[in-house]
Amino acid sequence: MESILLEDNPHWNNLSAYDNFISRELLPKAVSYLTTKQILALIGARRVGKSTLAKLMIKELLKTVEAKNIFFINLEKPEFIPYKQDASYLAEIFDNYLKLANPNLSEKIYFFIDEIQIFKNWEVFVKSKYENSNIKFIITGSNSSLLTSDFATVLTGRVLKISVHSFSFTEFLKFKNISYGSRIEQISNKIEISRAKDEYLKWGGYFDVISTDDVIIKKDILKNIAEDIIFKDIVPRYNIKNSSQLKDLFYYIVSNATSSLNYLGLAKKINIDAKTIKEYINYFEDNFLIHTISSYHTKMTEQIKSAKKLYLSDNGFLNLGINRTINNGVMLENEVFVVLNKFCEELTYIKENYEIDFRCENSLYQVSYNIEDEKTRQREFRAFENFDSEKKYKYKLITYDETSL
């Protein structure tokens, strides 16, 4: 146990342990939440950088907090597998930390628990310490159900959530050391920015993917990420019997990203019953592989019943499609979804006489790879005007090169 704790907490002996970590845009927000009493949950898919963000937070804490009052533990370690059904083992881990590190108990302890969903009934342990101890909990998890079923009965009102995603385009530019902040830099680095945009639209923002230039390795990494989520998270959590069927459905969805979803039609095509398809898609959503959006209706019951559109959580997954050349328009539309989904509380599409790709609060978005043809431009704006006769919305036409308002 002691060797595991020391391995996970190099900052106890080396205050510069995390100096080479690449910063994330979410860091200031995450650090600001450290001053609150509530449990902080960093939620997102596997390998988007939740653990890295946690360690960047530790780096900031080390400026004002004693190193041994900061405790990080990764519950995915093989040594913990035999105990994952026993939440009381979490108390044993914490007790071993107290004995080994001997933190200053008169000061707050910052307890980082990575991939907490590994342990069944973990929330009972967290609540017991939360109520009676001077401990700030920061937990990470790879399943959106952490914020619904598990939290609902035990930790309601005690949790603040931050959604963690793969690198944004601006983070990608920083990683590539391409300056873009000023208009002069944007003009001077126009070629480099354009090349980076092409690469980002095609391969997405997973750190391991953008860290290599080999396209074969990129694709292998993306496949490994997707199948780790399927076989390590979804299959055991939901007790899936036919895992190959689940995998096949995911690759079919990848090949049809940005399309409308018809459960009955899909069932006929791939020989899986519609009820099972619906369940599997919910599992993919719970584990941040895909997302669905509904058609906008003024009546919520109609919106819930409407046909869903499918999007991927990261553009890189588009490369895993079956016998498909990736369409530029699909890449751009999926990336626009990824960006809007980060801040839009209720993202929908509109399907009336003309389709509008996205509705977010008081804005309507159309996505077209290019609008050099005047007829194409007129068609896109006609969709806005047809839906919004009273001019209640802002119109945004997004192309590869620009956003028109």
For each predicted feature, which ranges?
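Conserved lysine of the Walker
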Residues: K50-S51
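Hydrophobic anchor at the beta1->P-loop junction of P-loop NTPases
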Residues: L42
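Accessory nucleic acid-recognition modules appended to NTPase machines
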Residues: E2, N69-F71, S211, V215-N362
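Interdomain motor-coupling "hinge/lid" segment immediately C-terminal to the ATP-binding subdomain
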Residues: E2-L6, N13, S144, S149-F250, ...
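A short, basic N-terminal segment
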Residues: M1-T36
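Short glycine-rich substrate-engagement loop in P-loop NTPases that contacts/grips substrate
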Residues: F72-E107
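Walker A (P-loop) phosphate-binding loop of P-loop NTPases
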Residues: R47
